[in-house]
Amino acid sequence: IGANPVLCRAMAYFHDVGKTSRPSMFIENQMAGDNPHDDLSPSISAAIIRSHVEDGLEMAKRHRLPQPIRDGIAEHHGTMRIGFFYGKALEQHGFAEGDPTLERQFRYPGPKPQSRETAILHLADAVEAIARTIGRGESDRLEESVGKAIEDRRADGQLDESDLTLRELSLIKESFLRSLCAIRHERVVYSVGESDETSSTEPDHDLEQLLPPPSSGTHPHGA
Protein backbone atom coordinates (compact mmCIF):
# COMPACT_ATOMS: atom_id res chain seq x y z
CA ILE A 1 0.00 0.00 0.00
CA GLY A 2 3.01 2.28 -0.33
CA ALA A 3 3.96 2.40 3.36
CA ASN A 4 7.52 2.13 4.70
CA PRO A 5 7.75 -1.18 6.62
CA VAL A 6 11.07 -0.31 8.27
CA LEU A 7 9.61 2.92 9.64
CA CYS A 8 6.54 1.03 10.88
CA ARG A 9 8.78 -1.41 12.74
CA ALA A 10 10.91 1.36 14.24
CA MET A 11 7.82 3.24 15.43
CA ALA A 12 6.45 0.02 16.93
CA TYR A 13 9.59 -0.36 19.06
CA PHE A 14 9.13 3.06 20.66
CA HIS A 15 5.41 3.84 20.60
CA ASP A 16 4.73 2.79 24.21
CA VAL A 17 7.99 3.95 25.74
CA GLY A 18 6.05 6.38 27.94
CA LYS A 19 4.63 3.45 29.90
CA THR A 20 8.04 2.95 31.50
CA SER A 21 7.38 6.03 33.65
CA ARG A 22 4.65 4.14 35.56
CA PRO A 23 4.79 0.52 34.41
CA SER A 24 2.58 -0.91 37.17
CA MET A 25 -0.38 1.17 35.96
CA PHE A 26 -0.62 -0.75 32.69
CA ILE A 27 -2.29 -4.14 32.52
CA GLU A 28 0.50 -5.90 30.63
CA ASN A 29 2.80 -5.30 33.63
CA GLN A 30 0.34 -6.21 36.39
CA MET A 31 0.36 -9.43 38.36
CA ALA A 32 -2.90 -11.34 38.68
CA GLY A 33 -5.18 -9.76 41.28
CA ASP A 34 -3.02 -6.66 41.73
CA ASN A 35 -4.52 -3.68 39.89
CA PRO A 36 -3.87 -0.20 41.35
CA HIS A 37 -6.75 1.20 39.29
CA ASP A 38 -9.18 -0.59 41.61
CA ASP A 39 -8.59 2.20 44.14
CA LEU A 40 -8.82 5.11 41.68
CA SER A 41 -11.69 6.98 40.08
CA PRO A 42 -12.27 6.35 36.36
CA SER A 43 -11.20 9.91 35.48
CA ILE A 44 -7.88 9.60 37.33
CA SER A 45 -7.23 6.19 35.79
CA ALA A 46 -7.94 7.57 32.32
CA ALA A 47 -5.59 10.50 32.94
CA ILE A 48 -2.81 8.08 33.93
CA ILE A 49 -3.38 5.87 30.88
CA ARG A 50 -3.49 8.92 28.61
CA SER A 51 -0.28 10.32 30.09
CA HIS A 52 1.89 7.60 28.54
CA VAL A 53 1.63 9.49 25.26
CA GLU A 54 2.88 12.77 26.75
CA ASP A 55 5.54 10.94 28.78
CA GLY A 56 6.71 9.12 25.67
CA LEU A 57 6.99 12.35 23.70
CA GLU A 58 9.00 13.93 26.49
CA MET A 59 11.40 10.97 26.52
CA ALA A 60 11.70 11.03 22.74
CA LYS A 61 12.54 14.73 22.77
CA ARG A 62 15.06 14.29 25.59
CA HIS A 63 16.84 11.51 23.72
CA ARG A 64 16.54 13.27 20.35
CA LEU A 65 14.62 10.56 18.58
CA PRO A 66 13.76 11.41 14.96
CA GLN A 67 10.49 13.18 14.22
CA PRO A 68 8.85 10.15 12.53
CA ILE A 69 9.34 8.15 15.74
CA ARG A 70 7.82 10.98 17.76
CA ASP A 71 4.88 11.03 15.35
CA GLY A 72 4.31 7.34 16.04
CA ILE A 73 4.24 7.99 19.78
CA ALA A 74 1.86 10.94 19.42
CA GLU A 75 -0.52 9.36 16.92
CA HIS A 76 -0.66 5.68 17.83
CA HIS A 77 -3.91 6.11 19.79
CA GLY A 78 -5.22 9.00 17.75
CA THR A 79 -8.10 10.58 19.66
CA MET A 80 -9.68 7.24 20.59
CA ARG A 81 -11.85 6.94 23.65
CA ILE A 82 -10.32 5.15 26.65
CA GLY A 83 -13.22 2.77 26.57
CA PHE A 84 -12.93 0.72 29.77
CA PHE A 85 -12.73 3.69 32.12
CA TYR A 86 -15.26 5.66 30.08
CA GLY A 87 -17.70 2.79 30.62
CA LYS A 88 -16.95 2.77 34.35
CA ALA A 89 -17.63 6.51 34.55
CA LEU A 90 -20.97 6.09 32.79
CA GLU A 91 -21.89 3.27 35.14
CA GLN A 92 -20.78 4.92 38.38
CA HIS A 93 -21.90 8.50 37.81
CA GLY A 94 -24.84 8.22 35.45
CA PHE A 95 -23.36 10.42 32.73
CA ALA A 96 -25.09 10.48 29.36
CA GLU A 97 -23.06 8.76 26.65
CA GLY A 98 -21.58 11.31 24.27
CA ASP A 99 -21.44 14.10 26.85
CA PRO A 100 -18.79 16.54 25.47
CA THR A 101 -17.11 17.10 28.84
CA LEU A 102 -16.86 13.39 29.48
CA GLU A 103 -15.57 12.79 25.97
CA ARG A 104 -12.69 15.21 26.54
CA GLN A 105 -11.71 13.50 29.78
CA PHE A 106 -11.73 10.02 28.31
CA ARG A 107 -10.10 10.49 24.92
CA TYR A 108 -6.44 10.50 23.96
CA PRO A 109 -5.03 13.90 22.98
CA GLY A 110 -4.15 12.94 19.42
CA PRO A 111 -3.53 13.94 16.75
CA LYS A 112 -5.19 11.31 14.61
CA PRO A 113 -2.78 9.32 12.41
CA GLN A 114 -1.41 11.61 9.72
CA SER A 115 0.39 9.02 7.59
CA ARG A 116 -0.02 5.47 6.37
CA GLU A 117 2.69 4.32 8.76
CA THR A 118 1.11 5.82 11.89
CA ALA A 119 -2.31 4.55 10.78
CA ILE A 120 -0.91 1.01 10.48
CA LEU A 121 0.68 1.37 13.92
CA HIS A 122 -2.63 2.65 15.32
CA LEU A 123 -4.50 -0.36 13.96
CA ALA A 124 -1.82 -2.92 14.82
CA ASP A 125 -1.69 -1.72 18.43
CA ALA A 126 -5.43 -2.26 18.81
CA VAL A 127 -5.51 -5.59 16.99
CA GLU A 128 -2.60 -7.04 18.98
CA ALA A 129 -4.31 -6.19 22.28
CA ILE A 130 -7.58 -7.77 21.16
CA ALA A 131 -5.84 -10.91 19.85
CA ARG A 132 -4.40 -11.57 23.30
CA THR A 133 -7.93 -12.16 24.61
CA ILE A 134 -8.83 -14.77 21.98
CA GLY A 135 -7.91 -18.40 22.52
CA ARG A 136 -6.02 -20.53 20.05
CA GLY A 137 -8.34 -22.28 17.65
CA GLU A 138 -10.95 -19.49 17.70
CA SER A 139 -10.07 -18.38 14.18
CA ASP A 140 -13.56 -17.21 13.27
CA ARG A 141 -13.71 -15.05 16.36
CA LEU A 142 -10.24 -13.70 15.61
CA GLU A 143 -11.23 -12.64 12.09
CA GLU A 144 -14.42 -11.01 13.37
CA SER A 145 -12.59 -9.15 16.15
CA VAL A 146 -9.83 -7.86 13.86
CA GLY A 147 -12.41 -6.62 11.39
CA LYS A 148 -14.44 -4.92 14.14
CA ALA A 149 -11.37 -3.19 15.58
CA ILE A 150 -10.51 -1.71 12.19
CA GLU A 151 -14.10 -0.72 11.41
CA ASP A 152 -14.63 0.89 14.84
CA ARG A 153 -11.63 3.13 14.28
CA ARG A 154 -12.64 3.98 10.74
CA ALA A 155 -16.19 4.84 11.90
CA ASP A 156 -14.78 7.00 14.71
CA GLY A 157 -12.87 9.05 12.13
CA GLN A 158 -9.44 7.99 13.35
CA LEU A 159 -8.21 7.20 9.82
CA ASP A 160 -9.69 10.24 8.07
CA GLU A 161 -6.36 12.08 7.88
CA SER A 162 -4.20 9.13 6.79
CA ASP A 163 -5.48 8.81 3.19
CA LEU A 164 -5.97 5.04 3.50
CA THR A 165 -8.64 3.65 1.18
CA LEU A 166 -11.17 0.94 2.01
CA ARG A 167 -9.29 -1.44 -0.29
CA GLU A 168 -6.05 -0.73 1.57
CA LEU A 169 -7.78 -1.32 4.91
CA SER A 170 -8.89 -4.71 3.59
CA LEU A 171 -5.29 -5.54 2.65
CA ILE A 172 -4.10 -4.43 6.10
CA LYS A 173 -6.69 -6.69 7.73
CA GLU A 174 -5.56 -9.66 5.64
CA SER A 175 -1.93 -8.98 6.56
CA PHE A 176 -2.79 -8.78 10.27
CA LEU A 177 -4.64 -12.09 10.10
CA ARG A 178 -1.75 -13.82 8.34
CA SER A 179 0.69 -12.56 10.96
CA LEU A 180 -1.53 -13.44 13.91
CA CYS A 181 -2.28 -16.92 12.58
CA ALA A 182 1.44 -17.53 12.03
CA ILE A 183 2.20 -16.49 15.60
CA ARG A 184 -0.60 -18.68 16.92
CA HIS A 185 0.32 -21.59 14.58
CA GLU A 186 -3.05 -21.54 12.85
CA ARG A 187 -4.01 -21.44 9.21
CA VAL A 188 -5.01 -18.13 7.67
CA VAL A 189 -8.72 -17.43 7.85
CA TYR A 190 -10.44 -16.34 4.64
CA SER A 191 -13.90 -14.80 4.38
CA VAL A 192 -16.47 -16.46 2.12
CA GLY A 193 -15.43 -15.91 -1.48
CA GLU A 194 -11.75 -15.46 -0.59
CA SER A 195 -10.83 -19.00 0.44
CA ASP A 196 -8.64 -21.39 -1.47
CA GLU A 197 -8.72 -25.16 -1.35
CA THR A 198 -5.88 -25.36 1.14
CA SER A 199 -7.24 -22.91 3.71
CA SER A 200 -8.75 -23.99 7.00
CA THR A 201 -9.91 -22.47 10.25
CA GLU A 202 -8.46 -25.39 12.20
CA PRO A 203 -5.08 -25.16 13.98
CA ASP A 204 -2.17 -26.85 12.25
CA HIS A 205 -1.41 -30.38 13.41
CA ASP A 206 1.78 -31.03 15.31
CA LEU A 207 4.74 -31.70 13.06
CA GLU A 208 5.20 -35.25 14.27
CA GLN A 209 1.64 -36.07 13.21
CA LEU A 210 2.52 -35.06 9.66
CA LEU A 211 5.64 -37.23 9.49
CA PRO A 212 5.49 -40.91 8.47
CA PRO A 213 6.10 -43.42 11.26
CA PRO A 214 9.69 -44.66 11.59
CA SER A 215 10.58 -47.86 9.75
CA SER A 216 10.40 -51.03 11.80
CA GLY A 217 13.64 -51.86 13.51
CA THR A 218 14.92 -48.31 13.30
CA HIS A 219 15.19 -46.10 16.40
CA PRO A 220 13.02 -43.00 15.91
CA HIS A 221 15.96 -40.74 16.69
CA GLY A 222 18.46 -42.48 14.43
CA ALA A 223 20.75 -45.49 14.58
Task: Give the location of each predicted region.
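Generic N-terminal initiation segments characterized by hydrophobic and/or small/turn-forming residues
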Residues: 147, 166, 177, 204-208
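Generic low-complexity, intrinsically disordered sequence content enriched
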Residues: 146, 184, 211-215
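Divalent metal-dependent catalytic cores for phosphoryl transfer on phosphate-bearing substrates
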Residues: 1-156, 165
